[in-house]
UniProtKB/Swiss-Prot annotation:
InterPro entries: Acetyl_CoA_COase_a_su (IPR001095), ClpP/crotonase-like_dom_sf (IPR029045), COA_CT_C (IPR011763). This is Acetyl-coenzyme A carboxylase carboxyl transferase subunit alpha. Transmembrane segments: none annotated. The lineage of its organism: Bacteria, Pseudomonadati, Pseudomonadota, Gammaproteobacteria, Chromatiales. It catalyses: N(6)-carboxybiotinyl-L-lysyl-[protein] + acetyl-CoA = N(6)-biotinyl-L-lysyl-[protein] + malonyl-CoA. Belongs to the AccA family. HAMAP family: AcetylCoA_CT_alpha. The keyword Nucleotide-binding applies. It is found in: Cytoplasm.
Length: 318
């Protein structure tokens, strides 16, 4: 279990600290304190269930950004086999903020693409904190075209604060790269299944999330701008980010209600970072089911299905 608790989890953190203290005492004592430990563990679980049953939108944003949340390579390691990473956009450079390559899912060849954030400072800098430059999106598009050529289903994993807004990225055509991905993904003649596993920020997320199915983990978010950015525009202060998060309706359950997301995938109690294996197994089963649904479609049906799904967004329900 993670030891990195968020502010709203402090009551849980205090209980977990007591449990850990008792465990250490028990190792050095002849007194049996197992019953007390079990009582506190049950209390901790009950408290966690209570807190997580009524999370605010801002608290969900914090969970989506949790530094110990599983990233792309954590899922690749647990869901896919024989992964072979492919590099470069064949035009400018290899952007480490987006990674992708061929792999096997249930023994069948697929293409896997996603944003990758870093764990330590060195990797965060190398991955640009999960904010892709244009060459990252062009690399992703190159891999998608390759997948289409060889008839491989495409699985994308979205986890980015947004596309990198630096001068160099803009000079090299950031907006063009994103727009081209949107247009070409809509026409791909292979199954495309997209999953938001953390942050789904703005065009940086959209550029690899045009699919036949869009899934979200329960404590992930998907929006046109960050809460801090929205608050800075509306109220001239990023301190009202919590209000912005609530107004933007960026949490998975609400987006599912609005018809933007096709499926919300449950997370382990306390969030995906509490149990990587359980989260990966749940996601694997969801991806397997969604692939079975779209895998029977012909290329023409896949394109039509994608167009219909996108056209339905924003239409009145019922």
């Amino acid at each position: 279990m993670t030891k990195n608790f968020l502010d709203f989890e402090q009551p849980i953190a205090e209980l977990e600290a007591k449990i850990e203290e008792l465990r250490n005492v028990g190792q050095d004592s002849e007194v049996n304190i197992n019953e007390e430990i079990q009582r506190l563990e049950a209390k901790s679980r009950s408290l966690t269930e209570k807190i997580f049953s009524s999370l605010s939108a801002w608290q969900i944003v914090q969970l989506a950004r949790h530094p110990e949340r599983p990233y792309l390579f954590d899922y690749i390691e647990r869901i896919f086999t024989d992964f072979q990473e492919l590099h470069g956009d064949r035009a400018y450079a290899d952007d480490a903020a987006i990674a992708g390559g061929v792999a096997r899912f249930d023994g069948r060849p697929v293409m896997v693409i996603g944003q990758q954030k870093g764990r330590d400072t060195k990797e965060k800098v190398r991955r640009n904190f999960g904010m892709p430059r244009p060459e990252g999106y062009r690399k992703a598009l190159r891999l998608m075209r390759m997948a289409e050529r060889f008839g491989l289903p495409i699985f994308t994993f979205i986890d980015t604060p947004g596309a990198y807004p630096g001068v160099g990225a803009e000079e090299r055509g950031q907006s063009e790269a994103i727009a081209r991905n949107l247009a070409e993904m809509a026409q791909l003649r292979v199954p495309v299944i997209c999953t938001v596993v953390g942050e789904g920020g703005s065009g940086g997320a959209l550029a690899i999330s045009v699919g036949n199915r869009l899934l979200m983990l329960r404590y992930s978010v998907y929006s046109v701008i960050s809460p801090e950015g929205c608050a800075s525009i509306l109220w001239k202060s990023s301190e009202r980010a919590a209000d912005a998060a609530e107004a933007m309706q960026m949490a998975a359950e609400r987006l599912h209600d609005l018809g933007i997301v096709d499926r919300v995938i449950p997370e382990p109690l306390g969030g995906a970072h509490r149990d990587y294996e359980a989260m990966a197994e749940t996601l694997r089963e969801a991806l397997r089911e969604e692939w079975a649904r779209v895998g029977q479609m012909s290329p023409d049906e896949l394109v039509a299905d994608r167009h219909q799904r996108l056209a339905a967004i924003g239409q009145p329900q019922g």
